[in-house]
Amino acid sequence: MKLIYLILIIFLNTNVFSEEQNKSHFYIVSDKLIITEQPLTSEFIGNVYARNAIHHFYGNRILVNYDNNKKIELITIIKNVKIVRSNEEIFGDRAIYDLKLENIIVSGNVLVKKNGDVLRGSQLIVDLINSTSTIKGNKDKQVSVKVAN
């Protein structure tokens, strides 16, 4: 019975907090939340916004996968992806934030806006450990860049 009340509170609130090893928290809001026990996942649907101390994520759906210790392992953002980082906006069709590898992979119609510059490609890999970003084209279209003066 206590479990039913807990799930009901989570559904009504549609907010999730998770403490990571580095003491950062994720705050997530959406129109709807579905929690699955085995494997432990949270699916946020509709007008989804998620943030931690550094990143802001927007999308139609966000899937949160947890490890065996109930720590967030992967965050997948699906459709109308927007990621806001310090002085940078990233757009795409899908993004995967791997908290263990500390990278973000954005795919499908990737657009990056930073300091007036605009980059377009099919895939972006952001390495948060080494502070590097790699944008790739595909066989039909190369990477394009518009540099601001």
Model-derived regions, located:
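Mature-chain termini and adjacent capping regions
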Residues: 1-149
